[in-house]
Amino acid sequence: MVLKKIKAGISVKIMLLFKHTVELKKHLKQNSNKVVGFVSTMGALHAGHISLISSAKKECDIVVSSIFVNPTQFNDINDLINYPRTFEKDFAMLEDAGCDILFAPEVQEMYSEEELLLKKQNIEDRSWTLGKEIHFGSLEKVMEGAFRPGHFNGVAQVVSKLFNAVQPDKAFLGEKDFQQLAIIRSMTKQMAFAIEIIGCPIVREKNGLAMSS
């Protein structure tokens, strides 16, 4: 059954919200015959993120998005503290875009205390995802990675956890963050996830500046 509500005189589908992996997996298992698309975000959404939702809707039966401000990819604790959190606005944007499911876990749902401690002790190109050690070599040490040591390890770690929770058929990422896209492709291959990684075209501001997604 598809739940709908009336918004501005128009009937729109209600987006489901899950905060726990077990409940999300249980729901998705009931729709195992459907093609699931996934768009991961840290919130503070804009048109670039919504374009990924639109791309996913064109190719998938169910579109899942996530909002999770990932602590393991920040080099500076102040950046983590000051990262914009606009959940209500983000929720409305995703629902209006036709996203079917939002996964918005707390930190405790995604990481154990031991994992957070291990991240603090992380050395150069070593990354632990779902108990498996993976390596990105020089891929994470150039461009943005040269100035943010450990950043892409944190990205790969959280995306692997999100992939494990959602178990999508396809994941949609913006080509603007090209290095991150390459890292996710590498992680997906090393972890043997049966997920198609789809890079989506860059969305730009009116002045030509690329939107980050």
Name each model feature, range by range.
Residues 1-14:
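N-terminal amphipathic/basic-hydrophobic helices that include classical n-h-c signal peptides
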Residues 12-213:
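Nucleotidyltransferase catalytic core that binds NTPs
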